């Protein structure tokens, strides 16, 4: 196979890698009825690209969600809760509740929060 044939093969493989996916869907804990210890994991349906954990007082909701709808208005409307805290994440089973009642933050999320602060501190340092 010459250089041209190798380039065509490489292009074809690259196109397949970009346009085909393995079929892996996001896994989230899913307990749409409030519970304090959700352990039911499901594969999210197509179009649901985010895991959600929402807390309204003692009520805790875990489910698959759409990232585009990860905002207070959409979540509070669907759950019919006027005051709540929520967290959306995009890794498998990332919407698990911690023992102390908090939500687990992934290492990447923490890094995304801390990095700009460190950069700002570095720039402001005389």
UniProtKB/Swiss-Prot annotation:
One Gene Ontology molecular-function label: complement binding
Query: In what residue span(s) does the UPAR/Ly6 domain sit?
Result: 26-106
What does the PTM comment of the record read? N- and O-glycosylated.
Q: Which residues are glycosylated?
A: 43
Which domain of life does the UniProt lineage start with? Eukaryota
Just give the chief location class. Answer: membrane
The UniProt function text for this chain reads: Potent inhibitor of the complement membrane attack complex (MAC) action, which protects self-cells from damage during complement activation. Acts by binding to the beta-haipins of C8 (C8A and C8B) components of the assembling MAC, forming an intermolecular beta-sheet that prevents incorporation of the multiple copies of C9 required for complete formation of the osmolytic pore.
Say where the lipid (GPI-anchor amidated asparagine) is covalently attached: 100
Protein localization: Cell membrane; Secreted
Q: Which cysteine-cysteine pairs are annotated as disulfide bonds in the entry?
A: 28-51, 31-38, 44-64, 70-88, 89-94
Q: Name one GO biological process term.
A: negative regulation of activation of membrane attack complex
Which residues are the signal sequence here?
Answer: 1-25
Prosegment location in residue numbers: 101-126
Q: Which GO terms describe its cellular component?
A: plasma membrane; side of membrane
- What is its membrane topology? Lipid-anchor; GPI-anchor
SUPFAM superfamilies in alphabetical order: Snake toxin-like (SSF57302)
Q: Which InterPro entries match?
A: CD59 (IPR056949), CD59_antigen_CS (IPR018363), LY6_UPA_recep-like (IPR016054), Snake_toxin-like_sf (IPR045860)
Under the subunit heading, UniProt states: Interacts with T-cell surface antigen CD2.
Keywords, A to Z, come to: Cell membrane, Disulfide bond, Glycoprotein, GPI-anchor, Lipoprotein, Membrane, Secreted, Signal
Q: What is this protein called in UniProt?
A: CD59 glycoprotein
User: Gene name?
Assistant: CD59
